[in-house]
Amino acid sequence: MNLLFFSSLLTALIILCIPLLLSFTPYYKLENYPHHVKTMIMWSFIISLVPMLSFLNGGVEATVTNWHWFTTQTFNLSMNFKLDLYTIMFLPIALLITWSIMEFSIWYMSSDPKINQFMKYLLIFLITMLTLISANNLFQLFIGWEGVGIMSFMLIGWWHARTDANTAALQAILYNRIGDIGFILAMAWFLIHTNSWEFQQMFLLHTNLLPLLGLILAATGKSAQFGLHPWLPFAMEGPTPVSALLHSSTMVVAGIFLLVRFSPLLEQNSTALTMALCLGAITTLFTAACALTQNDIKKIIAFSTSSQLGLMMVTIGLNQPFLAFLHICTHAFFKAMLFLCSGSIIHNLNDEQDIRKMGGLINILPITSSALIIGSLALTGMPFLAGFYSKDLIIESLNTSNTNAWALSLTLVATTFTAVYSTRVIFLALLNQPRFSPASSINENNPLLINPIKRLAIGSILAGFLLTSYINPTTLTPTTMPPFIKVTALVITILGFILALELYLTTNNLTLKPHSQLHTFSNLLGYFPLIMHRKPTAQNFFLGQNMATMLIDLTWFEKSGPKGISSHQLTILTSVTEAQKGLMKIYFLSFLITPPIIITLLLF
């Protein structure tokens, strides 16, 4: 069984590398290279099911050391792979979602002359994420961490002729640099105090708040928590397949996964858990509130990602790392599907992204619309869809834990907001009369478009049930929970639906009035980009200008530099020159002063 486990896992990873090796051959320039990449990922997914089923049957974890890297005094560094529950379960999920996105990309990017390079970048994006997931030491994890960061920069700015895409790519890399500072400082602390970067050695150490703060900062940047969140909504400026892969199973969940990996240390420090809880609660409410008034369909879905990441951070703060990982897995299915559905709509409507200019699509794009409804319902936590099995457990854990009641309240309000903006997308984009140009050529009869969406729709329906049925600790149902707590998540979700429906029916025929301050606050993202991107930039510019002109130019050149020396010399020369005017009284005065000075010097 072990031989089958390791050989199948190694085969799945090797197959992923074949398209990368082909990129150095003439085959890379052929038209069927994208299809080859898609096929390799499909076979890799099928083979990865073997170790997953083997793990579910035996439940044996393993650590594999493939290559000893180097040794410096007492510090050893090897290429280690940690094959535990998180790695084995996430691998087929990531491969299935990437397979679907790759197939969708062949249709979506068919007119792009560099589609081969685009597919290669997506594949590298996946490989770096799998490197991060399977790493057994911090250095290897850091390679995957930086890999997903640089690949997100390359892919978000894929359409580099667009200013918005370049700005979004720069935002992503700069905000993540701030988080990387925390990661590097945590690595340095662990190296100094444990002389090792392997997880097994670090987890033996008595917990300390400093490295945990660095890890939380790293997760805040990578998973777009409040304060370092503005890059995520703007990351949708890249092609839709990039958004689907980035928001579902790669970049943004890396920060949460980092904290899941370090849960043995986090659970020993209540301060770090409280920080994660409060940070996640603020993030999930703020981003859900921002999503309420957005009109760009991709931006709404992007804000929903940030809100769900906040919910995962809340789960980390509750010391429930497995529930956070479960929500990562279920969220990946319907979030990827939501982005693919939005890409189908945008592509068919000639790049129109405003939901106010859509409508009636359920009759024109029935498969896409049905999948969008399934994804929206799964996002809200509707029973028996994928999101319900993880989201309901998180709300139950919040209700039954002795934690900050404000965090619980904020999370419940954010859950209601999720139902509101999901319903708003369904009503404006899919129902009622069409509000787009009749010249749009709409057609979804393409297997490259329909098959990925169908595949992810099935996953959005069944993934939660399958994951919670066969994996501990969710297989045991708690029996001591009061009924009113058990149905809390469902009640607030239904309230959100009712609220959205009432608001839509009430305001449908009303004349437009100037927006309220709350609407403006939500629509402008809490003024956060305005404050953080303009004010500090202007202050730094003026500070740098003043330092350059006042301190450097004025002080160095004018006061103490060449001009300063010449001005001082000029003063002395002027005094000496004025003393030599040819007046007899000045000569007699100097004659009288000179002898006393000479006598004084001789005596003392």
Swiss-Prot record:
Question: Does the UniProt entry include the keyword Electron transport?
Answer: yes
Q: Which Pfam families match?
A: NADH5_C, Proton_antipo_M, Proton_antipo_N
Quote one Gene Ontology molecular function term: NADH dehydrogenase (ubiquinone) activity
Recite the UniProt keywords alphabetically.
Answer: Electron transport, Membrane, Mitochondrion, Mitochondrion inner membrane, NAD, Respiratory chain, Translocase, Transmembrane, Transmembrane helix, Transport, Ubiquinone
Protein's name according to its UniProt entry: NADH-ubiquinone oxidoreductase chain 5
**So what does this one do?**
Core subunit of the mitochondrial membrane respiratory chain NADH dehydrogenase (Complex I) which catalyzes electron transfer from NADH through the respiratory chain, using ubiquinone as an electron acceptor. Essential for the catalytic activity and assembly of complex I.
Quaternary structure annotation from Swiss-Prot or TrEMBL: Core subunit of respiratory chain NADH dehydrogenase (Complex I) which is composed of 45 different subunits.
What residues form the membrane-spanning segments?
A: 4-24, 40-60, 88-108, 115-135, 138-158, 172-192, 201-221, 240-260, 272-292, 300-319, 324-346, 359-379, 410-430, 456-476, 481-501, 584-604
GO terms for cellular component: mitochondrial inner membrane; respiratory chain complex I
Q: Which family does it belong to?
A: Belongs to the complex I subunit 5 family.
Q: What is its EC number?
A: 7.1.1.2
What reactions does this protein catalyze? a ubiquinone + NADH + 5 H(+)(in) = a ubiquinol + NAD(+) + 4 H(+)(out)
Please indicate if the UniProt record lists Membrane as a keyword. Answer: yes
Its ancestry begins with: Eukaryota, Metazoa, Chordata, Craniata, Vertebrata
InterPro entries xrefs: NADH_DH_su5_C, NADHpl_OxRdtase_5_subgr, ND/Mrp_TM, NU5C-like, Proton_antipo_N
Q: How does it sit in the membrane?
A: Multi-pass membrane protein
Q: Where in the cell is it found?
A: Mitochondrion inner membrane
Say which domain of life the source belongs to: Eukaryota
Q: Which GO terms describe its biological process?
A: electron transport coupled proton transport; mitochondrial electron transport, NADH to ubiquinone; mitochondrial respiratory chain complex I assembly
